[in-house]
Swiss-Prot record:
InterPro entries: Cold_shock_CspA, CSD, CSD_CS, CSP_DNA-bd, NA-bd_OB-fold. One of its GO terms (biological process) is regulation of gene expression. It is found in: Cytoplasm. One of its GO terms (cellular component) is cytosol. One of its GO terms (molecular function) is DNA binding. Residues 7-67 form the CSD domain. This is Cold shock-like protein CspF. SUPFAM superfamilies: Nucleic acid-binding proteins (SSF50249). It holds the Pfam family CSD. It comes from the Bacteria.
Length: 70
């Protein structure tokens, strides 16, 4: 089950395409992968940006899906 949320990009490594989002509701950080972004936002993603995303339960903990810049 996914849940729509907002948060701030805590870290993002353009080489690996991985990072973390800190959710606005104070829950634990959510894993971010470049494949969860639309193509336009993937070029602009950087630390400190506010994003909207769906939180899903991945094999390695909470992950972000359908990530958009807000």
């Amino acid at each position: 089950m996914s849940r729509k949320m907002t948060g701030i990009v805590k870290t993002f490594d353009g080489k690996s395409g991985k990072g973390l989002i800190t959710p606005s509701d104070g829950r634990i950080d959510v894993q971010l992968h470049v494949s969860a972004l639309n193509l336009r936002d993937a070029e602009e993603i950087t630390t400190g940006l506010r994003v909207e995303f769906c939180r899903i339960n991945g094999l390695r903990g909470p992950s972000a899906a359908n990530v958009y810049l807000s």
